Amino acid sequence: MDDKEILLANPRGFCAGVERAIEIVEQALARFGAPIYVRHEVVHNKFVVDGLRAKGAIFVEELDEVPTGQTVIFSAHGVPQAVRSEAERRGLRVFDATCPLVTKVHLEVARMREQGREIVMIGHKGHPEVEGTMGQVGDGIHLVEVVQDVANIEVADPQQLAYVTQTTLSVDDAATLVAALRARFPAIVGPKKDDICYATQNRQDAVKFMAPRVDVVFVVGSRNSSNSNRLREVAELLGVPAYLVDNAEGIEPIWLEDKKRVGVTAGASAPEVLVDAVVERLKELGASSVRTLEGVPERVTFPLPRELQTPD
């Protein structure tokens, strides 16, 4: 048995927006009973979604799958305005689990468009957060995913241009794209503060701190989790083999051959119980000690919708 050491990234796992979104579903189930409909996976984590489904949540992709008169929850990623309008038209009871930091971007987009600006959204095509943000306005918004896309944007007036970003991007990739936009459109304006959220930034920074100290990195998170995929990429860009695993069963023993120090982190939608199970699995595979690295403390919390708050 080799004597491996596990290093735990700090911070890792749940962020305030994810905790709030899960709590909204759980409180709605407690108040109103099953079924509670949720448009899209409330957060991108299989374990969390399966757990809520077992409690009576029904996950749908479109509102026409929600029967009239029922309760629907919008996922943490946010929704286009058309979805809100449809829910209102149909008289559905709505609880909005959109992360407040995503809502902030929605408000920025609406304000920029009202000012007569066209908008460039930096993000991943097809991601629900991007669809929700771009769906805040009827027109005048362009998506860029890679630097090459910047050359292909056609705008009416380069003097009247603004940008926003998806909240879960790679911090470094986003900076590269912003630089490319500024080079082509010197007058482009952006939000006062970067749209990439505190949790995305902190978790990427924690991996940057951990990666030089380990021989392999495991990121606990689901394949469809944008921020979890970015954590894996951050480690790989620093030259460390990195694997995205949904749970302990996803670990292949061969990945640990000749590895003395094993780094573990978790995406913002992955619960600590999965990290604990990964640590136990690594102990079975030869790890004998666990150490949590120092990191930035997080004290952010977001309140629930008033109707779901429990009295103190």
From Swiss-Prot:
Pfam families: LYTB. InterPro entries: LytB/IspH. [4Fe-4S] cluster binds at C15, C99, C197. It comes from the Bacteria. It catalyses: isopentenyl diphosphate + 2 oxidized [2Fe-2S]-[ferredoxin] + H2O = (2E)-4-hydroxy-3-methylbut-2-enyl diphosphate + 2 reduced [2Fe-2S]-[ferredoxin] + 2 H(+); dimethylallyl diphosphate + 2 oxidized [2Fe-2S]-[ferredoxin] + H2O = (2E)-4-hydroxy-3-methylbut-2-enyl diphosphate + 2 reduced [2Fe-2S]-[ferredoxin] + 2 H(+). GO terms for biological process: dimethylallyl diphosphate biosynthetic process; isopentenyl diphosphate biosynthetic process, methylerythritol 4-phosphate pathway; terpenoid biosynthetic process. It is an enzyme of class 1 (oxidoreductase). Dimethylallyl diphosphate binds at H44, H77, H127, S225, S226, N227, S269. Keywords: 4Fe-4S, Iron, Iron-sulfur, Isoprene biosynthesis, Metal-binding, Oxidoreductase. The active site is at E129. CDD domains: lytB_ispH (cd13944). Binds 1 [4Fe-4S] cluster per subunit. Its cofactor is [4Fe-4S] cluster. One of its GO terms (molecular function) is 4 iron, 4 sulfur cluster binding. Its EC number is 1.17.7.4. Catalyzes the conversion of 1-hydroxy-2-methyl-2-(E)-butenyl 4-diphosphate (HMBPP) into a mixture of isopentenyl diphosphate (IPP) and dimethylallyl diphosphate (DMAPP). Acts in the terminal step of the DOXP/MEP pathway for isoprenoid precursor biosynthesis. Belongs to the IspH family. This is 4-hydroxy-3-methylbut-2-enyl diphosphate reductase. It comes from Aromatoleum aromaticum (strain DSM 19018 / LMG 30748 / EbN1). The lineage of its organism: Bacteria, Pseudomonadati, Pseudomonadota, Betaproteobacteria, Rhodocyclales.
